[in-house]
Amino acid sequence: MSFDRKDIGIKGLVLYTPNQYVEQAALEAHDGVSTGKYTIGLGLTKMAFVDDREDIYSFGLTALSQLIKRYQIDISKIGRLEVGTETIIDKSKSVKSVLMQLFGDNHNVEGIDCVNACYGGVNALFNTIDWIESSAWDGRDGIVVAGDIALYAKGNARPTGGAGCVALLVGPNAPIVFEPGLRGTYMQHAYDFYKPDLTSEYPYVDGHFSLECYVKALDGAYANYNVRDVAKNGKSQGLGLDRFDYCIFHAPTCKQVQKAYARLLYTDSAAEPSNPELEGVRELLSTLDAKKSLTDKALEKGLMAITKERFNKRVSPSVYAPTNCGNMYTASIFSCLTALLSRVPADELKGKRVGAYSYGSGLAASFFSFVVKGDVSEIAKKTNLVNDLDNRHCLTPTQYEEAIELRHQAHLKKNFTPKGSIERLRSGTYYLTGIDDMFRRSYSVKP
């Protein structure tokens, strides 16, 4: 049977964010650090968080149910559901299997969970696109769910937490179309961030090394993308980053996104060594080897200065979500996409090309691209992002710590009833009601 495989991409999108946050400026004062350490140094304003009433299952159920409702999806016409997450509740049972309770009598649904730090969501998306392009496709659409709850022990990393979950409707004839064959990937073994202790929600993090890995993987993935882009489309004139009208990045912090966009120039400089825009960093580019360039602050500062105006126009709109929510791990890059759709008018986005970089520690990374071919005004409207973020509850740092303590008390427990209030949850949010003596979890929906 022949199916229409034209313009494969994103047809619908929902981003779920918790309905409470803590101000990063308040955390600075509470933690006794210098003013601006989190807000300026990391580029963060607010951090979303949850207590023991929400987990990755409830996140997925909430995001998926909202996608189905807002887009009036006939679930019998969904042939794949794939999940990306690193928030693990069970070492055997997948998050995808929990979400199947929303599919009624439709049991013929391919896909499973993808796990590798923050990269799993993009890998789930790639798998879904590849499924539609393959002989296994049966003509139905796919759904990708990506979400996490990012928590850190007390210390420098704690303000880089966050939480959120995205659900994407993927299929042909989409307004957001992925460019076929244009992906560059970089993978390597590294202990930069990992979670070997299953008795804790907290990761082991080598912070400086992880940022170095992020940049090194960006260099590799972007260079590999360029090889395929040149083979398909020929060499572009000028700097390579100017091929993209906008860019989105995985956002561990918003300051890191600004540095990452500037770093694209480092790879571009190899193809355009005499470009006059590089004059201010030409000596550094010629004297630093690749490894030293990863951590050289003078080069980083110089590249950021060159790309500042480009960043403000092409990237800044997308960091609205992570600035106000924090790091959502697998959902992070998609929160940036949601923000881009919400903050830039649909008529300005139409016809524009977007570059995208996904990174997951350990490590796995890809650079890819898509084109906004159709009208995305309805998608932007249905995300309801700005309204959701503007109407959340602002809690104190002490209340934040109390919520984290509730999660600590709930971790790995059975015969457990959550203590957190459901009062602040939005209508339609799934929440945990209890865990029985066999660790089976039960949920309800906030009316």
Curated annotation (Swiss-Prot):
It is an enzyme of class 2 (transferase). Pfam families: HMG_CoA_synt_C (PF08540), HMG_CoA_synt_N (PF01154). Keywords: Lipid biosynthesis, Lipid metabolism, Phosphoprotein, Steroid biosynthesis, Steroid metabolism, Sterol biosynthesis, Sterol metabolism, Transferase. GO terms for biological process: acetyl-CoA metabolic process; ergosterol biosynthetic process; farnesyl diphosphate biosynthetic process, mevalonate pathway. It comes from the Eukaryota. The modification Phosphothreonine is found at T398. It catalyses: acetoacetyl-CoA + acetyl-CoA + H2O = (3S)-3-hydroxy-3-methylglutaryl-CoA + CoA + H(+). Pathway: Metabolic intermediate biosynthesis; (R)-mevalonate biosynthesis; (R)-mevalonate from acetyl-CoA: step 2/3. Belongs to the thiolase-like superfamily. HMG-CoA synthase family. This is Hydroxymethylglutaryl-CoA synthase. It comes from Schizosaccharomyces pombe (strain 972 / ATCC 24843) (Fission yeast).
